[in-house]
Structure formats: C-alpha cells, structure tokens
Amino acid sequence: MSGTDMNVHKRTAAREAADMVKSGMVVGLGTGSTAAYMIERLGERVAEGLEIFGIPTSDDSEDKALKAGIPLTDFSAHRRIDIAIDGADEVQRGSLNLIKGLGGALLREKIVAQAAKRFVVIVDGTKPVDLLGERAPVPVEVISFGWECTAERLAACGARGVKPRTDRAGSLFVTDTGNMILDCHFGPIEKPEELAEKIDRIVGVVEHGMFLNMASEVLVATPDGVEHWEP
C-alpha cells in the first residue's frame, strides 16, 4: 500500500471518528497527521452548526483547531472531556494498550485521555502489534536537569538504547511544556504494567508514552474499510 493510499484510509477513519461527536460535547483534540484529519472534519461540522468546545493536546493542534473554526476551552472551565480522539504509534491487539508520543505531545495527550469519558484512537494498518515495543520506542518525557542520569536509569530498566530526541536542526527537542524526550528502545515488552511502574519511580521522569488500559475503542484504517476494535 502506497503512502498516498494509506493517507486516504487514515482520513476516512479520522472523519468517521469525528462524526461520533455530538453537539454539547467537550472534545479532546489529538496531535499528529491522523488527528489533523479529524480536526479538519470537526471544523466542517462546526460550520454546519455543530456546537462543541475543544481542548487541544498541543500547540500545533490548537493552531489547527483555531484555523478550522473550532471553539476552544480548557480544564479551568471543564474538568471532564466527553470524548477524546487521537492517533497512536502502536496499538496492542486485544488489550488495546498503546504507545504514543512520537509526535512529542505525550504528556498533554495522556492528561486529556485520562480526563475523557471515551477515548477513541485512530491508526492505520501498520500500527497494530502483538506486543508493545515491536516497532516503536517508548518516548519518555523528562526534565532537562540531569537527563543523562535519568537516561542511565531508563537503560537499567531494560532499554537497549536511550536516545535524546532532536529537532530538524539537530538541537534537543523541547516539548510544549518545556521538557525533553528520551526515546527508549526496549524491544517487545512482555509486561508493560511492570515496566511502567519502574519508569514511574525514576526521579526526573515526567511521563512515559505507554497508554495502558486507556483506549475505549480503536479505529483501524485498512484498504477494506475501517475496523472497530474494543478491549
């Protein structure tokens, strides 16, 4: 399947997810290329009369939402989100556990997902795996102070490689919340809950990109249509 075909399928799934939104809802707006299609469709529906408020998971999503004409709000006004829609870098078959954060917004994405009554994830057919970590590293957001020490402790958790993320200019990547990201290559992860607990105990770690037991539904874009997966 070509990249163009894949984008067509992702757009179809993203628009289907956007059509789940109803007037009166507060919507978590994901980050990334797939989520961008969802934001585009929500903008069309707002222009047609849909009344919603969005909470974006990144500065980029905020910009896209404003350009699409979607009214925005924040957690000072709404503590709960009716539905959050986002992409993922890996989804584990069966459990629907996820790896997210290769787009650099994992902290805000996880805050929004946790606050959502329903968390819908959109992926293409290359993202499902039997075990998390088969293809994607686990992004770990860390504070910059002492990151070298934090990286050593992540390696001690079993990471085969720990690499600070850089931007296109080769400088250290900085998240919207002012932190760094260390991409940790663990390989296939047999016990993600245990690994998550180990990472959470490391001083300097802000958040990791394993979204465990959080997805309500996953829409998988395939050449034959959109598959709906539930835990």
Curated annotation (Swiss-Prot):
Could you name the active-site residues? E109
Question: In the record, what terms sit under GO molecular function?
Answer: ribose-5-phosphate isomerase activity
Q: What pathway or pathways are given for this protein in its record?
A: Carbohydrate degradation; pentose phosphate pathway; D-ribose 5-phosphate from D-ribulose 5-phosphate (non-oxidative stage): step 1/1
Q: Which residues form a coiled coil?
A: none
Q: Which CDD domains match?
A: RPI_A
For the protein in the UniProt heading, the enzyme class is isomerase
Which Gene Ontology BP terms does the record give?
pentose-phosphate shunt, non-oxidative branch
Q: Cite the EC number.
A: 5.3.1.6
Chain positions recorded as substrate binding sites? T31, G32, S33, T34, D86, G87, A88, D89, K100, G101, L102, G103, K127
What keywords does the record list, in alphabetical order? Isomerase
Annotated catalysed reactions: aldehydo-D-ribose 5-phosphate = D-ribulose 5-phosphate
Q: Identify the InterPro entries for this entry.
A: NagB/RpiA_transferase-like, Ribose-5P_isomerase, Ribose5P_isomerase_typA_subgr, Ribose5P_isomerase_type_A
Q: How does it assemble?
A: Homodimer.
**Function field:** Catalyzes the reversible conversion of ribose-5-phosphate to ribulose 5-phosphate.
Q: Which family does it belong to?
A: Belongs to the ribose 5-phosphate isomerase family.
Query: What's the name of the protein?
Result: Ribose-5-phosphate isomerase A
